[in-house]
Amino acid sequence: MLDIKRIRTDFEAVAEKLATRGVDAAVLNEMKEIDAKRRNILVKVETLKAERNTVSAEIAQAKRNKENTDDKIAAMQNLSAEVKALDAELAEIDAKLTEFTTTLPNIPADSVPVGADEDDNVEVRRWGTPREFDFEPKAHWDLGEDLGILDWERGGKVTGARFLFYKGLGARLERAIYNFMLDEHGKEGYTEVITPYIVNHDSMFGTGQYPKFKEDTFELSDTNFVLIPTAEVPLANYYRDEILDGKDLPIYFTAMSPSFRSEAGSAGRDTRGLIRLHQFHKVEMVKFAKPEESYEELEKMTANAENILQKLNLPYRVVALSTGDMGFSAAKTYDLEVWIPAQNNYREISSCSNTEDFQARRAQIRYRDEADGKVKLLHTLNGSGLAVGRTVAAILENYQNEDGSVTIPEALRPYMGGAEVIKP
């Protein structure tokens, strides 16, 4: 959520920044006018209340003097009616301002590339060289079906489109991947957490999914509960409405969880395979940091995600997202894109973002600065470390052999009982 004080005092700069995210200047101008009206009304209310207090004191004195107070009582009643009317108007204005501040995206950091969409993203670096096959590589969905480890047909029968069963070594591979990821993140100082997979609406608001992106979620009918779209939601809300001790920062959390997404607006995109599902596993990283340290922590988090890909020997690239492609809550985002041979393309497998104080303001997560004793908003960061299903897809395609078998990456073999190959 944006700071109304920053918008008020640095309006032109904020408007310029948000314009790069597609926010119409007219929206901000309306917000500015409403905020000015609110402050004017507040001045009027305080003036009227002061007058009312004066009249009240005069009435009390008149009664002590046995004087007639009818006129003063009428005047006080008029003042009270004016205050009541202005308070009602203030409530309407506050609701409108809340709507503005909760539906506007975060202000992009100065280092974010300016652009309209993903075509304006900037590649930062690459790691690894895509493998050259001496045979036509298969898509991971064909490999999975031929190996008998991925079953979309029965997933569709049991549930519907974009659902599947993992079987045998496919299920073992999925489990090996997320256990490996959690172990690696643990080495980097992350505390492993098992979160609730259902959260309330306040939690969804805290991380920015609600109210703007309600259609992308699975709500439990007639309840205050939602299936989590990512473990970021419960992890980032862990300290909601709390004040932390500054000396304890930064704090690192990691969790593996299922993620549930309706994929509204994704009809026709990635209809086959593991890239876009309604339910998938993901290992998430979340950090709570002091503002002056948060961008250093973003670089570390991105490196933590890269470490997984490097140890799995999967070629990837790091991309800085443009202002027009970043997520709603992010001030800066790096995407990690892994090489998918059958698509001859890099596909997103992780997003690592610094939301600065955007989520912390919504969730009221603060810390007491040990230097000056003041209570301040901290910065929150989140990143995929990694999307597990997409990692399965990348391994199947990059490690496939001409006979249809798939070699298991060395880093995962200890998690698979020493198995080296998945054979038809």
Swiss-Prot record:
Pathway(s) it belongs to: Aminoacyl-tRNA biosynthesis; selenocysteinyl-tRNA(Sec) biosynthesis; L-seryl-tRNA(Sec) from L-serine and tRNA(Sec): step 1/1
Superkingdom assignment: Bacteria
Gene3D superfamilies xref list: Bira Bifunctional Protein, Domain 2, Serine-tRNA synthetase, tRNA binding domain
CDD domains on file: SerRS_core (cd00770)
Intracellular or extracellular location(s): Cytoplasm
Binding residue positions for ATP: R261, S262, E263, E348, I349, S350, S351
GO MF assignments: ATP binding; catalytic activity, acting on a protein; serine-tRNA ligase activity; transferase activity
Reactions catalysed, as given in the entry: tRNA(Ser) + L-serine + ATP = L-seryl-tRNA(Ser) + AMP + diphosphate + H(+); tRNA(Sec) + L-serine + ATP = L-seryl-tRNA(Sec) + AMP + diphosphate + H(+)
Keyword terms: Aminoacyl-tRNA synthetase, ATP-binding, Cytoplasm, Ligase, Nucleotide-binding, Protein biosynthesis
A Pfam family per the record: tRNA-synt_2b
PANTHER family: SERINE--TRNA LIGASE (PTHR43697:SF1), SERYL-TRNA SYNTHETASE (PTHR43697)
This protein's domain notes: Consists of two distinct domains, a catalytic core and a N-terminal extension that is involved in tRNA binding.
Self-association state and partner proteins as the record states: Homodimer. The tRNA molecule binds across the dimer.
Name of the featured protein: Serine--tRNA ligase
